[in-house]
Every structure is written in C-alpha cells, then in structure tokens.
Amino acid sequence: ESVAELVELSAPRARRLAGKRSLVAGAPPRPGVYLFRARNGQVLYVGRARDLGARLRSYFRTDRQRPAVEAALGALDRVEWRVLGSELEAALEELRLLRELRPPANARGTRPDRYVFLRRRGSTWCVTETPGPFGPLRSRRRAQAAARALGDWDGEPSAALPSLRAKLRRIAAELRFEDAARLRDRIAALEDVCAALAELDRLRSLEVCVVAPAVDEGFERAYFVSGGRIAAARTLLPGSAGAAELHAGLAAAARAATPCVSETQGVDADELLLLASFLRRPPPELRV
C-alpha cells in the first residue's frame, strides 16, 4: 500500500485526482457551502460558492491550488455540500463552520485576532489588535501605511486627507519623486482605510436594516442588522406566515439594538465586514 501511495503522489496532478472527480458529481448550480472530508471523517477544508457544481469541478482541473488545499485534495475521501438560498447566506454559514471546525486547509476566518484597529497613542497613530472605534480592518499592511500617513495628526483620520494631498502636490512640484511616491502610496492606503471605516460606521449606526438577498421565488432569507451586528435571521414565506416572521425579526433586532456602538470585535467583525461587501452589490442581487 505504501508503494501504491508513492506512485500516486509521483503521478501528474490530473491523473492523481481523476478518480476523485466522481465525488462532486451531482453538485447543483446553486449557492451553498461544501466540506472536504478525509477517510476518518475529519473536515479538511470548508468553502462557499455561488455555483456549487462549477466551483467543485474546478478543483479537479489542471490548475494547482495553494499547497494546503492541494494536501486536502490528496487526502480527500468524500465531499459534502449544502444548498442555501443565496450567496450571502452561504458566506455567513461558511463563517460559522470555519469558527466551529477550524479546518486545517483554510487560511482565513479561523483567527479572531487577525483584525487590526487604528489608534492614537501619545502624539502619533499606531496599529493595534485592541478593539476601538477605528476598525476593524482586515489588512495590517494597509493600516500601518495609513498610520504612517497620519503621523502626528490630531483629529479624525479622514480630515487629514486634504492637507496630505496638498503636501503631495508640493513635494511633486519640488521634483522629490521618491518622497512623492512614498507619500502617494500612504495616502492611497489612508483613503482605503477611511472608506472602510465610513462603511462600517454606516452599518453600526443603523437602528434596523433588513437585508434580503435574491433567492428562488417563493421564499427569502432575511437578515436583520442592528447595533453593528446581525441580530436575527428569518425565512420569509409568502402570505401571513412571512409577515409574522418579519415582525419577529424586527422585534429581535429592536431588543438587540445598542444605543451607541462604536467598537466591533470577534464574530461581529466577521459578519459586519461580510455584510459591508455584499451591500456594495447592485440589485436585483441584493435588496435592502
């Protein structure tokens, strides 16, 4: 058996994985989540897809995946999938599974300390993992560049942009091209950070926001956002049953509302950033 395993490992990728393509036969062209399991039942990898069938088949083409996923494919014994009503629902379920299962081949969604925040410390700005009003931010590198752009600025981060842009024009006019390029990159990082913070602040300030991703006709999964987090989720069926679920969701959101939420952490950060990305999508994919 060990010799056979060595032969399999030395074969070209497509040949090694050809026998496993049948594991994804029948996966539908619908949104959902999927799990790769080893022979002993261990969950190796969790993913989500807008089209389960297309995504799962893509793993068995000639293009290599990143090393951890390649290792999971090598140990793969069975694939499970779960059809859900929308890509947003699939993304939220993926977050839950990642936190619960912590599969070894997943690189994201399993460490609550991966978020960073901007904070003024003394006379300068720094990047910290301690929750505060200026975050959460996904990219430590961009946050560090934004902090360097702010320097000793004493005020809201976004208010520093006009003076920084004026400084950039002055440096460029003086033909200090290396300094100008460095400052340009820092300003770009600060602009990204400020845009992300503004989007998060809008979500955190909502009394109640009902997000209903487009799904198959006949039912909708609605998410009730309040106090900077998803306070409730309800399936809205046609007719009086759907109206009752809507009122129940609104009541749950009202109970969960926080008068002033300026900090976000942990699971709420995951869901809030995910919601922010989906709220940028145009109708009819999303209705708010």
Model-derived regions: residue spans:
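N-terminal cationic and glycine-rich segments that engage phosphates or anionic surfaces
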Residues: V3-V288
